[in-house]
Every structure is written in C-alpha cells, then in structure tokens.
UniProtKB/Swiss-Prot annotation:
Keywords: Ribonucleoprotein, Ribosomal protein. One of its GO terms (biological process) is negative regulation of translation. GO terms for molecular function: mRNA binding; structural constituent of ribosome. Disulfide bonds: none annotated. This is Large ribosomal subunit protein uL13. The keyword Ribosomal protein applies. InterPro entries: Ribosomal_uL13, Ribosomal_uL13_bac-type, Ribosomal_uL13_sf. Belongs to the universal ribosomal protein uL13 family. Gene3D superfamilies: Ribosomal protein L13. This protein is one of the early assembly proteins of the 50S ribosomal subunit, although it is not seen to bind rRNA by itself. It is important during the early stages of 50S assembly. Coiled coil: none annotated.
Amino acid sequence: MATFSQKPAEVVKKWVLIDAEGLVVGRLASLVANRLRGKHKATFTPHVDDGDNVIIINADKVVLTGKKYTDKKYYWHTGHPGGIKERTARQILEGRFPERVLEKAIERMIPRGPLGRRQMKNLRVNVGPNHQHEAQQPEVLDVAALNRKNKGNA
C-alpha cells in the first residue's frame, strides 16, 4: 500500500468552539495547535493545511499555573536601539488585549513559515462569551472533560 498524501482539494474542515474559562493556558494552546495543524486526523499531511477552524471564547478567563501570572514575561523589540520592552502575563491579561496571552501561546506552538501563518488564520479568539460564527454551527469541544489537569485551580 502506498503512502497516503492528501491533496488540498480533498480537505474537509470542521468548526470547533472552545470555552477557555478556567482552562490552563499551555494545555489549551497545545490542544488547539494540534487541531489547527490537523494532527488529530488520520489524513494528516505535513505540507497541507488540513486543520479545523477553531473559535475560542472567554479567552480573558484563562488560568496560568504556579507563579507564571506574576513572573512570566513577554518580550518584544521596537526596532530602535535599546528598544527591548517587557510585560508580565498579569499586565497583559488585565490590559486592553487579554486574548494575546492565548494567541501567542498557540502561535509559538505552530511551525513558523507560510503554512503556519495560513493555519493561524483559522483561529478566532474572543474575549467575551460571544462570537460571530453561529452560522457555521461550530461543534462544542469540552477541553476540561478531556483531562482533569486541563482545568485550573484559580
């Protein structure tokens, strides 16, 4: 039997809805990254965008374990000399765009390159309980029920 290689025209994408309230960031990000890449499917082909469309709601209510809430730092550079900047996870989660903690965690688990950028476009992260994709009839995925460690204590 020959090795199976999926063609882009044969891809069937599902819509998945995940409620992130009370879930641990890293565990959720790992699961979502695998869904976006399509690694949960038997038809996975490394060079084809085979993943599902993922909608995450309540991204501002995620949980960080240990002291990461106060100690984890996010760095970026402005491009100017001496322009290294940093913020803690707490500052970001309490700031204007709290969904970025989850977005960055997922983005950093997906390979960098043209295919990774295309797969990241299949991710929609929302701060509140509402989303604009009711018409796609997303299937609800209960991440907390998959493993007891997925749910945070806080």
